[in-house]
């Protein structure tokens, strides 16, 4: 059964014109885009999104960075999309991320690593509901799915 994940191109990725490259990588893997929007993250939304890091020393920097410019928020659907997206993104630290991964190819530092993706079904559900209303997500079938699954 297909699952959904939340993927966000962070402000550094938007500024560096990487949205199209990132969308293309997910499409080429056969995943289906069901929601997307360019948006400015409010401080309140950023604090909710990063709530699990609230007590960490870098929390303020996370919030400041994610609110520093527009992000491109997306919901992708497909078989094992959460695990596959994590693999496609690469390690959080771009210096440790393998070449061919999004962070390995485009990330600069841990703080400017281009992309965020949900790390579990629970976080995917939470993050999707933070950034999207249900009516903003579009379910549809593609003929190519028969060739992929």
Curated annotation (Swiss-Prot):
InterPro entries: NDK-like_dom (IPR034907), NDK-like_dom_sf (IPR036850), Nucleoside_diP_kinase (IPR001564), Nucleoside_diP_kinase_AS (IPR023005). SUPFAM superfamilies: Nucleoside diphosphate kinase, NDK (SSF54919). ATP binds at residues 10, 58, 86, 92, 103, 113. It comes from the Bacteria. Transmembrane segments: none annotated. One of its GO terms (molecular function) is metal ion binding. The active site is at residue 116. It is an enzyme of class 2 (transferase). Its EC number is 2.7.4.6. Its cofactor is Mg(2+). One of its GO terms (biological process) is CTP biosynthetic process. The modification Phosphothreonine is found at residue 92. Belongs to the NDK family. Homotetramer. This is Nucleoside diphosphate kinase. The gene is ndk.
